[in-house]
Regions:
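Boundary/linker segments flanking structured domains
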Residues: 1-44, 49-55, 61-162
Length: 162
């Protein structure tokens, strides 16, 4: 369980579980297979390489569909999702071809409390609750991959302090 301390007296606890792995497949058109049991429920997910490098964090109303979209990149109607799907799919293919392993972690429940008391569950049916946990998990990362990825999208120069 990850505990995220907010600036106020509130604290959010997120429960992460390993649900499967990503492997290369010769019989699938794009070469990706997701192994494990990913639930068809709302939540937040992490794609990690070599068990330590968390490479991508996202959220979805249906985790099974969202994660499978990476295997079927190019079949989605929305252009922004298709771009993300192809980018993550390409990255996963490269990592797996380089001999690395990839795992999928999900968070389907999180709790909020004020000063450690009165813990309440954050309903993940609400997109904003998923976005809060996703943002906290991204902020919690210590590796540079996500940071570099986000910075590349900004067209002007800026200074980032660690």
């Amino acid at each position: 369980m990850d505990n995220y301390q907010l600036r106020s007296q509130y604290q959010i606890a997120a429960c992460w579980s390993l649900v499967g792995s990503v492997t290369l497949s010769v019989d699938v058109k794009n070469g990706l297979t997701f192994n494990g049991s990913i639930p068809a429920c709302p939540g937040v997910y992490k794609l990690c390489v070599q068990k330590t490098l968390c490479a991508y964090i996202g959220e979805g109303q249906n985790l099974l569909k969202r994660i499978n979209n990476y295997a079927n990149a190019g079949w989605i109607e929305k252009a922004t999702k298709e771009f993300t799907n192809r980018r993550i799919q390409g990255w996963l293919l490269k990592e797996l071809r380089d001999g690395n392993s990839a795992e999928i972690y999900i968070c389907t429940e999180a709790f909020i409390s004020k000063s450690g008391c009165n813990e309440k569950q954050l309903p993940f049916d609400n997109k904003y609750n998923r976005l809060i946990v996703e943002s906290l998990a991204i902020n919690d990362l210590q590796d540079d991959w996500t940071l570099k990825n986000k910075v590349k999208k900004i067209k002007h120069s800026l200074t980032i302090e660690k």
